[in-house]
């Protein structure tokens, strides 16, 4: 027997109850066992028992899961889905969801009915097949950071709109509805994709495609055009403030005993804002036996434009970088920006080179014996690294290898900067950032480490605002993992 805990609600107060249940059964079976053997009368929803109806979704150890397909574990905590009004025990109020579905017209709309029988081409049906796989479990809504702080309805609503927007029979302008339903509030953190039991890629298959369609029809965020102007003028998404990194460094930095030769993709912020981070990266790579080639004519990866629907600029930048990096004789291209790495890996389909995050490279060539560093730190998982590239073990392996460094792990949560939200919807970005800042301060650390210049900037700003608003004396530093390593090699 093992022990699990269930969060109860009797209509007036919440409380926790623990029960012993058999091993090797599902959470749904455990709840039924508890009601039968303990007469607990826990209320919950369930129907198909086969992961098809979505009704049994609950929060398990902090993550939304289907009770019918999740095995019980000792110490497991079961709660109702977060982000919804709780009616009783594990039952949440789904009524607002269904009303909103009707509000966005989740049905095929024809304005001009065909006179003859239409033949659906299999290719078009297949394109939308993934979007039709939703089982309405509402897991994605329960974890969406934008929905939590704004009137953005959430991922599954955008999936519904995309489902019809890309159906050639529908004639309702779903991209316009998406625009007015605040599709640009989405940070593209892909937490919705991570928790979806049907593995629907809502970010790439729905959000970004709807944004591209909306942009083509003139529905966009005005501030995103400023970023567009920057890249068309400077080949960077930000304006130059001091001498760029690419004008400060050499073309090649050889390692003494070369284990690997890489091309360094700097990204916009490291080139134009965080030049010292770029220099630290070169120093750290060389110290680990990695020679560094630095192409001076590289440009923005295009991530801000892929994410915000500006496909024309994104494709133009991609072509430029492919022409540069496809010619290089290196083992791989290394990035120190989560957004750049995710874009190169996932959007550069025509590339002839392998892309690796710097933490991948360092753990593969072998970590050094680092100098001790007395510091209490936590790590922020950039969304485009953890979910965009499936990299989360390597940074932790590096941090845990530094002697005397006290590492406090916290929940992986979006900082609010991505998906064009920091530039286009700063108020939304700040609200999400405030939540992240609170978690970091609650960890009582000296510094937060990350592997994304964009996260670094936004978390630093969020911590500063949180400190001032709450009159906190403690200062928490924010740094890229390469800058931390530069201190201990």
UniProtKB/Swiss-Prot annotation:
Binding site for [4Fe-4S] cluster 1: 134, 137, 140, 196
Listed SUPFAM superfamilies: 2Fe-2S ferredoxin-like, alpha-helical ferredoxin
Record key words, sorted: 2Fe-2S, 4Fe-4S, Iron, Iron-sulfur, Metal-binding, Repeat
Gene Ontology CC: plasma membrane
UniProt cross-references to InterPro entries, sorted A to Z: 2Fe-2S_ferredoxin-like_sf, 2Fe-2S_ferredoxin-type, 2Fe2S_fd_BS, 4Fe4S_Fe-S-bd, 4Fe4S_Fe_S_CS, Beta-grasp_dom_sf, Cys_rich_dom, Helical_ferredxn
2Fe-2S ferredoxin-type domain ranges (all copies): 2-84
Cross-referenced PROSITE patterns: 2FE2S_FER_1 (PS00197), 2FE2S_FER_2 (PS51085), 4FE4S_FER_1 (PS00198), 4FE4S_FER_2 (PS51379)
GO MF entry, a single one: electron transfer activity
Keyword Cell inner membrane: no
Ranges for domain 4Fe-4S ferredoxin-type: 123-155, 177-205
Family: Belongs to the succinate dehydrogenase/fumarate reductase iron-sulfur protein family.
Protein name: Uncharacterized iron-sulfur protein MJ0092
